[in-house]
């Protein structure tokens, strides 16, 4: 959500992950709640978002959240494995400097899923 402060704060973390792991198969996909295409385009430019962003109505996004474990926090992060199942999820911002263990857990799960040694 473009109005979400913690969402904005975690963009550099996801940009870093996208840069480090995209060529190995990771695809970061942001999903924004209640924004239109123009708002999202301006947001991604202003905040230098280096990964694709989707947008949708709160109703559509709530359905997605329900389908992916019933988590309704903004932000929420999900690591979806190659088989389409959720292998890791976290309700809240993932900020390396604030919570290094959560960031390390995510990196570990990414590397495990991508089979990186």
Per-region residue spans from a language model:
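Conserved redox-active cysteine motifs that mediate thiol-disulfide chemistry
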Residues: 1-16
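Conserved segment of the thioredoxin-like fold in thiol-based oxidoreductases
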Residues: 16-60
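Non-globular targeting/processing and membrane-anchoring segments
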Residues: 110-117
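Short strand-loop junctions, especially beta-strand C-caps/beta-turns
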Residues: 2, 31, 92-93
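Extracytoplasmic/periplasmic, Sec-exported soluble proteins
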Residues: 6-9, 32-35, 72, 98, ...
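Thiol/disulfide oxidoreductase modules built on the thioredoxin-like
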Residues: 46-49, 56-109
């Amino acid at each position: 959500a473009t109005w979400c402060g913690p969402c904005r704060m975690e963009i550099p973390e996801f940009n870093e992950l996208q840069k480090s792991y995209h060529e190995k198969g990771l695809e970061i996909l942001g999903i924004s709640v209640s924004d239109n295409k123009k708002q999202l385009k301006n947001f991604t430019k202003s905040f230098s978002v280096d990964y694709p962003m989707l947008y949708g109505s709160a109703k559509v996004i709530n359905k997605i959240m329900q389908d992916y474990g019933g988590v309704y926090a903004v932000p929420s992060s999900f690591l979806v494995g190659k088989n389409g199942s959720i292998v890791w999820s976290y309700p809240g911002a993932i900020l390396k400097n604030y919570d290094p263990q959560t960031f390390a857990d995510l990196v570990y799960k990414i590397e495990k899923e991508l089979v990186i040694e």
